[in-house]
């Protein structure tokens, strides 16, 4: 009996030639049902999920030889599947994007290589161990490498953490108690090829199954669908490969069903398929089943056929497999990626397998919830970044309809140069195995429309070899690969990441051209699909609409995959027992890239960020257009169905006419729209008022359709029919004027009217207090504000050790922007018949060199109705950097949580991310106005605001609309605190009134990405507003 020491002495995990010992060839998924199984055993599969015994060792040399035969006294219970770093004090998760978490010296890994020793006892009866069967154990995901023992006997070894490892353990099993033991290594040479942007964790993190298979069985079962040019005739081809006994007298029968009705049945004997000039392979068989006028599969209409494939000898069925079949044709034609002859528009997102509680393990309910949320937010495609997913995910995507890019588990981002390994023929077998096994397992899924060679591994000769193997094995699907410039010979699709719409990013090698330009380059006729774009880190996705305007305009710009789906924040607790979401460095992990793991459209608990709503709107499947007669009257609206394959007959169009935020007309129309058609709707309404008039259009799902629930908002659009100019006037007659009481002291100026007092500090120039009925209404002075709590996009760090000096935060810090010194240079006041006017001017100086950065002049007008009107002029004195905002900030005293405003909403919106927001009157609480980004930052802005009412405060736009935040947290606290749970509500409420606010950006998060039109680059800015404080219900 070979000892553990002898097995480990080979150092398989550092041998480039060895990727496995005794692992069985991978194949498409099988149920292994047969007639004997039905009689003798209900399920030929036992789940080994659940509690296992676990022992942890800091390195391989610490392993106790006794563990091979029995559990150690110190072993503890661990749950499988999950990662050991999340279940006890065994190790810490490490988050790093590019940098390897160990010294780079391939194929070698550190001697201090932690090991997890798992074991589980399994009881089997004699029926399970019946003759003519084998027992296999299948590990669907183990990282990064493992050795297997059964009942003390060594069985094998496997690498590649994201594909199944199947072993035949028939000879090692016995009736009664059996012990399955797995020794999992944290690092192996495979880790050099798994340098993905994610938490680095270890263990058995996918399902483990013990399966009972017939000795004579299908080794593999490949199903391919073929369509003629007109899509009228299809062929379902079944290719089976035998393992076990001789193929003599063995046949395969395939029967195709649709909605339970048999369509065609065929039987063939093995050896009927000519392979080459030497003839047939006796262990292979091919069958063809014709289908007339097939119901085609697409993500919009995921029609599936059932096929029953049986292996038999005329008397007995050895194996029966029931599969789902989706008939569709994927091709690149005339420079376009097409499905069923229609050019696709990829509404895609990248998705890691991640759960905030269980790490790499994602259960079926979460998968279904993700698919539902994707489809309800108008996504149709997922790139499986950056490795094959659990098999159940593909089945669900086949069933409910999503296009998939299946990606090989290959990324060598942290080596220099990036193709150091992928250009080395020594590693070709390892890389090729990861591609071939992916294709072999996933071949039958109609949801997979593109294969990917991996991610961020440069471009080497090994990529060419993998590309050719896939092309020869599966010519029915295109291949994409981003590495080496996104347009190498190893990709059928130009697949850049973070290329911009109109801006070239010129580099010494592998420049990223503007996507509009890229498709027009000489001799370039491939479609362009962004494998990653719109980096959704924190408060992001600014400028997203620009991509979609380009996608809609240029046919060869066929969409892309947002980065990414969900924040990778791990739910943990601090020493006080308080739960919070952790990111890089929170576990003392090093190296780490901090909060760069938090770049999803969803928070870690899978609730939506505002950016998700922006994506949903821009990607929606319907378009709305108004038609006007020569007089300018709106007569018709055209509703277009942009689905390629789906008839919309289970949805209702609802449109409302609103005047002054009040609904004056509502109409509902049941839709019946064929794909790629439109309906013209007659509009008959009249409004003679001079108020704002809007038309809100919605399309709502009537009843549940697959995972899309009834009542789901499918699409919407707002048309502004009349835009009333902003006008504010006093409401009292001059006959009612009362005298102001003015107290002009050395250090202060007080203006009293009735029960109100306004106080100005003459030394600082600020409005320092506002007292109403003896109560202070402001807790801090009303002061200029030019900065914001830095967004992740402002900080601009993808690698902590590689900070970009051009990042906004770095530029603001370098000039002292966030801590400007104030200097009052003018303070005057005058009393007129109708009002008191106070004028001030401040200079704002850099604390570094005392250079004047801004000059701000204000005129305060207090009238006899108690309104404070504020007129602000700001002059920028330096060209760079531009400010984050031009506005005012104050901490106000408040006794209520209710907020009402008229402006863009209801969700958080910023100047470059507000396509999804519409005008209206919105009611919200302070909590609803706040966006809880895990890494605190500027948040919750609402733009294009006509008025705001909070507590007894009413703020109205004067000359133009404004933006605001209301929060219990100051910008200073948001800037200082690193985690959401550390924020402490402050006294009162912080109000930020912005005349102007720069965009948030989001083309990427490591370089300045705010488009020029959303930067505050003008020399002069002017804004104004009116502020009143009325007891009781204020009139707005």
UniProtKB/Swiss-Prot annotation:
Keywords: Glycosidase, Hydrolase, Magnesium, Metal-binding, Sodium. Belongs to the glycosyl hydrolase 2 family. Mg(2+) 2 binds at residue 592. It comes from Leuconostoc mesenteroides subsp. mesenteroides (strain ATCC 8293 / DSM 20343 / BCRC 11652 / CCM 1803 / JCM 6124 / NCDO 523 / NBRC 100496 / NCIMB 8023 / NCTC 12954 / NRRL B-1118 / 37Y). Substrate binds at residues 97, 197, 456, 532-535, 599, 1006. It catalyses: Hydrolysis of terminal non-reducing beta-D-galactose residues in beta-D-galactosides. The keyword Magnesium applies. Its EC number is 3.2.1.23. Na(+) binds at residues 197, 596, 599. This is Beta-galactosidase. The record marks 352, 386 as: Transition state stabilizer.
């Amino acid at each position: 009996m070979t000892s553990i020491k002898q097995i480990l002495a080979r150092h398989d995990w550092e041998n480039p030639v060895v990727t496995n010992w005794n692992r069985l060839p991978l194949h498409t998924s099988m149920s292994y049902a047969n007639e004997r199984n039905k009689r003798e055993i209900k399920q030929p599969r036992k789940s080994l999920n659940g509690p296992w015994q676990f022992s942890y060792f800091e390195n391989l040399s610490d392993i106790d030889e006794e563990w091979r035969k029995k559990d150690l006294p110190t072993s503890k219970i661990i749950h499988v599947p999950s990662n050991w770093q999340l279940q006890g004090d065994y190790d810490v998760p490490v988050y790093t994007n590019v940098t390897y978490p160990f010294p780079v010296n391939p194929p070698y890994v550190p001697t201090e290589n932690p090991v997890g020793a798992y074991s589980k006892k399994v009881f089997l009866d004699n029926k399970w161990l019946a003759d003519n069967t084998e027992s296999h154990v299948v590990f669907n995901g183990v990282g990064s490498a493992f050795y297997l023992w059964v009942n003390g006997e060594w069985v094998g070894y496997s690498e590649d953490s994201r594909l199944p490892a199947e072993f035949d353990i028939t000879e090692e099993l016995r009736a009664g108690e059996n012990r399955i033991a797995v020794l999992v290594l944290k690092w192996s040479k495979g880790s050099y090829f798994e340098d993905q942007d994610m938490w680095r964790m270890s263990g058995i993190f996918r399902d483990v199954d013990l399966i009972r298979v017939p000795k004579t069985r299908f080794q593999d079962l490949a199903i391919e669908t073929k369509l003629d040019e007109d899509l009228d005739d299809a062929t379902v081809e079944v290719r089976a490969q035998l393992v076990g006994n001789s193929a003599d007298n063995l046949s395969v029968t395939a029967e195709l069903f649709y909605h339970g009705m048999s369509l065609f049945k065929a039987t063939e004997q093995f050896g009927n398929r000519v392979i080459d000039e030497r003839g047939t392979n006796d262990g292979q068989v091919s069958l063809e089943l014709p289908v007339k006028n097939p119901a085609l599969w697409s993500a919009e209409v995921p029609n599936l056929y059932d096929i029953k494939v049986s292996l038999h000898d005329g008397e007995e069925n050895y194996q029966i497999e029931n599969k789902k079949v989706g008939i569709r044709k994927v091709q690149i034609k005339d420079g376009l990626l097409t499905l069923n002859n229609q050019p696709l528009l990829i509404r895609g997102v990248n998705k890691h397998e991640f759960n905030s509680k269980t790490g790499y393990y994602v259960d079926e309910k979460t998968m279904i919830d993700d698919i539902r949320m994707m489809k309800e937010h108008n996504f149709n495609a997922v790139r499986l970044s950056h490795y094959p997913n659990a098999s159940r995910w593909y089945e669900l995507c086949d069933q409910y309809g999503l296009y998939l890019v299946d990606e090989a588990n290959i990324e060598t981002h942290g080596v220099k140069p990036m193709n150091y390994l992928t250009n080395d023929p020594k590693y070709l077998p390892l890389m090729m195995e990861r591609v071939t096994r992916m294709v072999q397992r996933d071949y039958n899924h109609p949801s997979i429309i593109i294969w990917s060679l991996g991610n961020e591994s440069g471009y080497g000769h090994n990529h060419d070899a993998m590309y050719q193997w896939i092309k020869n094995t599966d010519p029915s699907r295109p291949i994409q690969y981003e590495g080496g410039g996104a347009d190498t010979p190893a990709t059928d699709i130009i697949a850049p990441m973070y290329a911009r719409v109109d801006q070239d990013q010129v580099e010494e090698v592998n420049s990223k051209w503007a996507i509009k330009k890229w498709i027009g380059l000489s001799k370039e006729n491939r479609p362009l699909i962004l494998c990653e774009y719109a980096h959704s880190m924190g408060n992001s996705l600014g400028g997203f609409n620009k991509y979609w305007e380009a996608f809609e305009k240029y046919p060869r710009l066929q969409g892309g995959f947002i980065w990414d789906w969900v924040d990778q924040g791990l739910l943990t607790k601090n020493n006080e027992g308080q739960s919070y979401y952790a990111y890089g460095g929170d576990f003392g992990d090093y190296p780490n890239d901090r909060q760069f793991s938090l770049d999803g459209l969803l928070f870690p608990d899978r609730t939506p960020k505002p950016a998700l709503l922006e994506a949903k709107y821009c990607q929606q499947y319907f378009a709305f257009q108004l038609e006007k007669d020569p007089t300018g009257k709106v007569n018709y609206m055209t509703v277009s169905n942009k689905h390629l394959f789906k008839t919309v007959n289970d949805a209702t169009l609802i449109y409302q006419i609103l005047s002054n935020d009040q609904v004056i007309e509502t109409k509902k129309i049941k839709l019946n729209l064929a794909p790629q058609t439109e309906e013209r709707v007659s509009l008959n309404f009249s409004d003679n008022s001079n108020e704002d008039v809007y038309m809100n259009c919605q399309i709502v799902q009537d009843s549940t359709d697959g995972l899309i629930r009834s009542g789901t908002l499918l699409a919407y659009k707002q048309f502004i029919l009349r835009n009333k100019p902003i006008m504010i006037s006093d409401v009292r007659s001059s006959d009612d004027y009362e005298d102001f009481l003015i107290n002009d002291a050395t250090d202060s100026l007080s203006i009293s009217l009735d029960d109100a007092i306004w106080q100005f500090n003459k030394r600082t120039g600020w409005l320092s207090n506002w007292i109403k009925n003896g109560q202070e209404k402001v807790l801090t002075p009303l002061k200029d504000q030019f900065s914001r709590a830095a967004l992740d996009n402002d900080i601009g760090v993808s690698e902590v050790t590689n900070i970009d000096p051009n990042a906004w935060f770095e530029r603001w810090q370098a000039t002292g922007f966030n801590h400007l010194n104030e200097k009052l240079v003018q303070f005057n006041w005058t009393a007129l018949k109708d009002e008191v006017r106070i004028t001030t001017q401040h200079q704002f100086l850099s604390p570094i060199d005392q250079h004047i950065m801004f000059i701000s002049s204000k005129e305060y007008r207090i009238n006899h109705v108690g309104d404070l009107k504020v007129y602000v002029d700001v002059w920028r004195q330096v060209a760079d950097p531009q400010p984050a905002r031009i506005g005012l900030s104050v901490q106000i005293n408040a006794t209520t949580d209710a907020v009402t405003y008229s402006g863009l909403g209801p969700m958080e919106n910023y100047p470059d991310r507000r396509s999804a927001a519409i005008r209206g009157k919105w009611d919200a609480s302070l909590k609803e106005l706040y966006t809880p980004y895990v890494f605190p930052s500027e948040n919750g802005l609402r733009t294009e605001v006509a008025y705001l009412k909070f507590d007894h405060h009413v703020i109205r736009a004067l000359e133009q609309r404004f933006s605001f935040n209301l929060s219990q947290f100051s910008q200073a606290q948001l800037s200082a605190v690193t985690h959401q749970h550390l924020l402490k509500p402050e006294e009162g409420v912080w109000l930020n009134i912005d005349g102007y606010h720069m965009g948030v950006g989001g083309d990427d998060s490591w370089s300045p990405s705010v488009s020029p039109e959303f930067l505050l680059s003008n020399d002069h800015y002017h804004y104004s507003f009116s502020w009143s404080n009325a007891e009781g219900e204020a009139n707005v």
